[in-house]
């Protein structure tokens, strides 16, 4: 008699969750997706940037061509400072030359729509399924939903975002079975220091397709990305007056967004374009608190967290969605190895736990690096202290030709699906060559030289600047 199939229950029809569904389908691993909302791809004004590390995985899944039709590759970045100084560089063009994939921005809704419409078995993606409880026992796990349904699997995956119910359930079970495993410090480790008004606007004269503007200001930064047909994806990120601890964080309405944009309306971001123009041309917009954290408890028994449910960043370096896509690819690869290569269809609790420990051991160091870069990025863009003001205004412009090298370090060691062929377009000198890490090492050394120069020179600049001001 044939053994029961290994089954994965995915909580959350997010980009991470749907990517995992595609990956598992390619590996012929049984699964089901439970989404709490009544539709998979609502238009909420959110946008995402797809970088080569995420793009190569979607290319492996055969989805990249559909996404390219909807987008315009970014080529040029303009950086603007409060004193009127600005410079431009070809960071994005260099990224494309190094990796074979462009960087592009698109509606989050459109990416979700492509992920859903191209998925071959819609009966495995269920909506109106709010997970209320996680249960685990020897050899199995299940979740219950608010309509009374129960879904059992060998593995439960939380891809349900920053407000993850599965994360809360993991903590609840851990507190019962292993008190102290999830510490009080970890439960209070996610914080909010910034708010973000984000939106999508109709084309504006002066904001050309394929370009990006990053306006550094004191306590404020504005990011615009100009997509296909001139459509503008934008973020207005502001420093709050104090740090908040999740879940006791501010909640914002559309009225709050309007009041903020009205107050900031005359602030110029690029040439004659002001924040008010973005708001007036909006098609959709929203406002939210920006949570930041990388949790330390990634899995418990037969449940694991992916994407924003376990590592949450601000949008400044554009790696949030890409990181979730990588999570999905690595987990699918490990499951495939367990079920299809080792032929363990019904693994023990110990075997599943070892697989999840392996996942965390691989992903945590990379995500910690990306998280640190993101945390520093938003604080430099908002000129959070004197050091970052000098660094952003006087040092970074001198190293603009090296920005692609620095950005490459967040791309080059990204996870891929190890059971599917590498895409043909995954080419260029940026990727590591088999048996040869020289390019990556050289890039890392160049970054070290740049950072060492900053460390040595910046204190003198701080002293001189302080003397002039005070």
From Swiss-Prot:
It catalyses: (3R)-3-farnesyl-6-hydroxy-2,3,5-trimethyl-4-oxocyclohexa-1,5-diene-1-carboxylate + 2-oxoglutarate + O2 = (3R)-[(10S)-11-epoxyfarnesyl]-2,3,5-trimethyl-6-oxido-4-oxocyclohexa-1,5-diene-1-carboxylate + succinate + CO2. GO terms for biological process: novofumigatonin biosynthetic process. Pathway: Secondary metabolite biosynthesis; terpenoid biosynthesis. The active site is at residue 216. Pfam families: FAD_binding_3. Gene3D superfamilies: FAD/NAD(P)-binding domain (3.50.50.60). GO terms for molecular function: FAD binding; monooxygenase activity. Its EC number is 1.14.-.-. FAD binds at residues 35, 49, 108, 308, 321. GO terms for cellular component: membrane. It is an enzyme of class 1 (oxidoreductase). It is a single-pass membrane protein. Its cofactor is FAD. The chain crosses the membrane at residues 450-470. It is found in: Membrane. Its main location: membrane. Residues 1-23 form the signal peptide. Coiled coil: none annotated. Glycans are attached at residue 121. Disruption phenotype: Completely abolishes the production of novofumigatonin and asnovolin A, but accumulates farnesyl-DMOA. The keyword Glycoprotein applies. FAD-dependent monooxygenase; part of the gene cluster that mediates the biosynthesis of novofumigatonin, a heavily oxygenated meroterpenoid containing a unique orthoester moiety. The first step of the pathway is the synthesis of 3,5-dimethylorsellinic acid (DMOA) by the polyketide synthase nvfA via condensation of one acetyl-CoA starter unit with 3 malonyl-CoA units and 2 methylations. DMOA is then converted to farnesyl-DMOA by the farnesyltransferase nvfB. Belongs to the paxM FAD-dependent monooxygenase family. This is FAD-dependent monooxygenase nvfK. The lineage of its organism: Eukaryota, Fungi, Dikarya, Ascomycota, Pezizomycotina.
């Amino acid at each position: 008699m044939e053994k029961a199939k290994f089954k994965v229950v995915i909580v959350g029809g997010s980009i991470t969750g749907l990517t995992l569904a595609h990956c598992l389908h390619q590996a012929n691993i049984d699964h089901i997706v439970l989404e709490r909302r009544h539709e998979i791809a609502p238009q909420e004004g959110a946008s995402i940037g797809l970088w080569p590390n995420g793009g190569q995985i979607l290319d492996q899944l055969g989805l990249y061509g559909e996404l390219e039709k909807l987008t315009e590759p970014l080529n040029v970045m303009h950086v603007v400072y409060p004193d009127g100084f600005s410079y431009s560089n070809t960071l994005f063009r260099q990224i494309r030359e190094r990796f074979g994939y462009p960087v592009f921005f698109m509606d989050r809704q459109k990416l979700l729509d492509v992920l859903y419409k191209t998925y071959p078995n819609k009966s495995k993606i269920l909506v109106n399924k709010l997970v209320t409880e996680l249960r685990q026992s020897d050899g199995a796990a299940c979740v219950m939903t608010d309509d009374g349904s129960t879904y059992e699997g060998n593995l439960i995956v939380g891809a349900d975002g920053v407000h993850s119910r599965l994360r809360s359930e993991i903590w609840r079970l851990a507190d019962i079975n292993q008190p102290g495993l999830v510490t009080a410090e970890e439960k209070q480790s996610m914080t909010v220091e910034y708010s973000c008004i984000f939106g999508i606007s109709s084309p504006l004269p002066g904001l050309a397709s394929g370009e990006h503007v990053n306006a550094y200001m004191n306590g404020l930064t504005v990011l615009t990305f100009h997509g296909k047909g001139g459509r503008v994806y934008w973020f207005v990120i502001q420093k709050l007056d104090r740090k908040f601890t999740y879940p006791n964080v501010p909640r914002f309405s559309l009225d709050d967004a309007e009041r903020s944009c009205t107050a900031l309306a005359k602030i110029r971001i690029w040439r004659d374009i002001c924040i008010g123009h973005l708001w007036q041309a909006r098609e959709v917009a929203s406002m939210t608190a920006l949570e930041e954290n990388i949790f330390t408890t990634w899995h418990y028994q037969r449940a694991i967290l992916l994407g924003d449910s376990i590592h949450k960043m601000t949008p400044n370096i554009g790696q949030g969605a890409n990181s979730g896509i990588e999570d999905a690819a690595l987990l699918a690869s490990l499951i495939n190895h367990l079920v299809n290569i080792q032929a363990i269809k019904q693994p023990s609790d110990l075997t599943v736990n070892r697989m999840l420990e392996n996942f965390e051991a691989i992903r945590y160091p990379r995500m910690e690096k990306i998280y640190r870069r993101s945390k520093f990025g938003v604080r430099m863009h908002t000129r959070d202290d004197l050091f970052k003001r000098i660094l952003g205004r006087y040092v970074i412009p001198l190293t603009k030709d090296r920005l692609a090298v620095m950005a490459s370090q967040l791309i080059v060691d990204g996870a891929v699906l190890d059971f599917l062929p590498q895409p043909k377009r995954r080419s260029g000198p940026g990727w590591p060559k088999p048996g040869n890490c020289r390019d990556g090492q050289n890039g890392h050394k160049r970054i070290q030289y740049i950072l060492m120069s900053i460390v040595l020179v910046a204190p003198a600049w701080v002293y001189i600047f302080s003397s002039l001001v005070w």
